[in-house]
Amino acid sequence: MLTDPDLPQEFERMSSKRPASPYGEADGEVAMVTSRQKVEEEESDGLPAFHLPLHVSFPNKPHSEEFQPVSLLTQETCGHRTPTSQHNTMEVDGNKVMSSFAPHNSSTSPQKAEEGGRQSGESLSSTALGTPERRKGSLADVVDTLKQRKMEELIKNEPEETPSIEKLLSKDWKDKLLAMGSGNFGEIKGTPESLAEKERQLMGMINQLTSLREQLLAAHDEQKKLAASQIEKQRQQMELAKQQQEQIARQQQQLLQQQHKINLLQQQIQVQGQLPPLMIPVFPPDQRTLAAAAQQGFLLPPGFSYKAGCSDPYPVQLIPTTMAAAAAATPGLGPLQLQQLYAAQLAAMQVSPGGKLPGIPQGNLGAAVSPTSIHTDKSTNSPPPKSKDEVAQPLNLSAKPKTSDGKSPTSPTSPHMPALRINSGAGPLKASVPAALASPSARVSTIGYLNDHDAVTKAIQEARQMKEQLRREQQVLDGKVAVVNSLGLNNCRTEKEKTTLESLTQQLAVKQNEEGKFSHAMMDFNLSGDSDGSAGVSESRIYRESRGRGSNEPHIKRPMNAFMVWAKDERRKILQAFPDMHNSNISKILGSRWKAMTNLEKQPYYEEQARLSKQHLEKYPDYKYKPRPKRTCLVDGKKLRIGEYKAIMRNRRQEMRQYFNVGQQAQIPIATAGVVYPGAIAMAGMPSPHLPSEHSSVSSSPEPGMPVIQSTYGVKGEEPHIKEEIQAEDINGEIYDEYDEEEDDPDVDYGSDSENHIAGQAN
């Protein structure tokens, strides 16, 4: 029965129709393919065999026990049936066995499958005829086999590739089934290792997922932080922009306020510029005085420095603005219009800061009155001239705190132009002027006499008396001036000379106190001291009085610096080549040359400077430099050259001689002797707040058109250093920034000595 050639084919067909697991695992299929290959090989060798997928480890299991009755049943049936029936029964039994144990062959190797097939073949061959009770079970097995085939057909129709999750589940199912079917777990190879590997894989996956989750959370947190920081930055930027906008708004508001203030100031300036800067009297004048003063063009602005003119009728050019100049040059303006101008100017002055002090317009007598009617000498003892001097002179508030007062030694018959000296504080002046005007002598004022012929005549007589007195005093002073000149005040080198000079100074001071001409401390002539205005004393002494020097202390010159040492000779050379060159131009030339020089070229002059400084320190150990304030001088609104100024001085002296010789009443102003200074009205910043009504010997010209200019009379009697002190600043009104001109060489003189000698000998 076993040698029937049909059996191998039948078994081959049965084995090829092995039921697969419902999950279609790959291992079972591989095992079946391997068993088929072996069967074919054996058939080719002529050794047919039965290969049933029976596991080796099943004999002790219930399945194997069930298998034995089945095999016995198949043997019995085979014994009682015909070969055909036996063959069919074997086929059914084989299918049953295959279907029963097919799941157990999935995890076994091909060798185990082959062994199982051989054992099954042997068991089948060794089985005898089974009992009838077993047939029902075999029929059930056949039914199961048919069901298995249908399932296989369904599985074959499904896709060969199943999802990876099904593969994993199928492996797990196989492992569990093998573990259940086999009591010996140790015989299952790879089970602990696979579990450990899977556990490791699971742990790795868990770790990866955890790390990925952490990364995602960290990235999410970073994004949140970044978004929060961006929001914060945006908020800060918005706040900053808001602050900037607020600041810009505040700045714009401030700019608008400043612009508004500027506009207001410009409007005020325009209003003031349209009005002529008129001279406002300290006390209210009458309309006739205003009209007379305005018609003559004598309109002096309070903040404008008076600089006398030089034209033939001697018009006083006092108005810096075009409006005022037009008003001065237009005599056709009616008194009412001029009064309105004055009133407007007065209102502007009252509104303006207190630094602008109104001055007193000097009246003009016109053709009806002689020009000598409105000036008195303040050096006389009579009170009325003092009051007239106080009110007859316009105030000059822009001048530097220096005085131009001095004596007129060569004009004993000439009246004196009073130069008001006002302290830098404006309050004391305002307080002193009304006090002076309230006195009985103040009522005899210039403006009060403008249209009063009797008063004018009286003033003329007083002026003549003062001239006579000045003539007598000048004759006495001529000798003293010569002595002072011979001593050489600037170049005293011996103690004897200094002692003589100091004694002479004391004598002059005593003379001054006796005559009572200079009772005001502000006008203390400490070196000259003569009430008649001695020409031999430099007016710079008066200026230095405000710097706190003692009454008997002589002026100590500063030691020359390197530039002064070098410029001394260079200046003389330039003047020799260009006698008419202005000192400002000379200083510019010298300054540019000095800057262009190298240090090696300057070295000798620096050495000379050191030597002079050492010598000066040894001679004057207590010396302290006290700079005097700078000032500029303009004549007719412009700076004059030396030649032009000398020509003007010559004309003044010639006309003065004519007036003295002919005995005319017209008074020509005389400047302080020893000070070649064209400005007759100057402000001196003196410590005393009182008006210098008692000690001004400068002649005052009653005629508004008369140029008030200081001459060079009596310069012969003055010492050389006086010339050098005044030549740079007073003659030309020029102040050098390079050095103090008064420290120049005493021999340098920009004015001609011949003119000074002639002026000194004129009377």
Curated annotation (Swiss-Prot):
Its main location: nucleus. Residues 193-274, 448-515 form a coiled coil. Changing residue 362 to P: In a patient with amyotrophic lateral sclerosis. Keywords: Activator, Coiled coil, Differentiation, DNA-binding, Intellectual disability, Nucleus, Phosphoprotein, Transcription, Transcription regulation. It comes from the Eukaryota. Gene3D superfamilies: High mobility group box domain. Residues 556-624 bind DNA. Residues 727-752 have a biased composition (Acidic residues). The modification Phosphoserine is found at residues 21, 370, 411, 414, 439. This is Transcription factor SOX-5. It comes from Homo sapiens. The gene is SOX5.
